[in-house]
Amino acid sequence: MVGKAEDLDLCFGKMMVFGGDGVGGGMMRGVGVITEWKDIPMELLLRIVSLVDDRTAIVASGVCSGWRDAICLGLTHLSLSWSKNNMNNLVLSLAPKFTKLQVLILRQDKQQLEDSAVETIAKCCHDLQDLDLSKSFKLSDRSLYALARGCPNLIKLNISGCSAFSDAALGYLSGFCRKLKILNLCGCVKAASDRALKAIGYNCGQLQSLNLGWCENVGDVGVMSLAYGCPDLRALDLCGCVLITDESVIALANNCLHLRSLGLYYCQNITDRAIYSLAHRRLNNKNMWKSVKNRHEEEGLINLNISQCTALTPPAVQALCDSFPALHTCPGRHSLIISGCLNLTSVHCACAFQAHRTASAFPHPAH
């Protein structure tokens, strides 16, 4: 720590010298010359703060009132995930100061965060767009109600593992946070119900990514509501949603034309009918995809997890592979996951056929 302080003093001395006449006289005669740390321009201070870790930025905000005001007004991204024991008190102390925050990461390894902290965030940080509350096991519906009232500009929300939230509170939140594009509900067994998904489908039409992993109460009614209400959906994780059937996948295939990633791990009610509906949407939407072929973003499925979907047959999955060349079964590029489906080992992606054609083009040497 002493070494760091000496380095800072050395740098400060150089700034004072170069700010004046080259021999140190700038401290007395230069106009606007840096003579103390508090004289550093706000733009330079924020640039320096952007290069250090969040803990250092917080310490810097306590150096003097000038630094405090500059950092509190200029800091837009903050992570407190490094705090192992005192996160709740930190939030209660910092949220009223850092009112311009747009991104706040409060991911935890053990229970720390309480409703009082989230309520303070909602009261003070109205510009918040990205909030990570994952593994906040102590939080109750009070937190979601507070966010609904205070943070209407949320675009990305991660509440994975927050098992105490109810579907009523989640539905209420969706009615106020209508700009949501990325929502992680993995493990939110009570909150992620068909009733909540109907509310999300009705209110959050801009939604692009939704993680419903291991939300075992989710059924076809909820997923179909999402498919109809969120046509721009790009990524949907339904892994462990054991109640869904082909009807959910068919609704997604017909309505979510930009869907690129779909997780169906352990959805054992899924049959070939669902897979063929995905494969055929490539043909049905061929003209639409031609119109966007110049976009940087690739259209069509590029990731699919059908592990443990034991009712599927090779012809259906092969048809899907043929329709979407970006789905790979080859080593190192696995984007079609079929673990636990021993009857699908014959399915191969386009790379395998290309390699076979290349090998066939060269005659075997004579023995």
Model-derived features with residue positions:
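F-box-proximal linker/hinge
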Residues: 64, 79-127
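Short helix-loop-helix/strand-helix junction enriched in hydrophobic and basic residues
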Residues: 57-73
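Inter-repeat linker/turn residues at the boundaries of leucine-rich repeats
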Residues: 65, 73, 99, 123-126, ...
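CRL adaptor-proximal regions
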Residues: 1-39, 366-367
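Conserved hydrophobic beta-strand positions in leucine-rich repeat
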Residues: 78-80, 104-107, 129-133, 157-159, ...
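A structural signal for leucine-rich repeat
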Residues: 92-96, 118-124, 144-150, 170-176, ...
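Short, solvent-exposed loop/turn at the beta-strand->alpha-helix junction
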Residues: 84-90, 110-116, 137-142, 163-168, ...
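Short hydrophobic alpha-helical "box" of cullin-RING ligase substrate receptors
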Residues: 40-52, 66-67
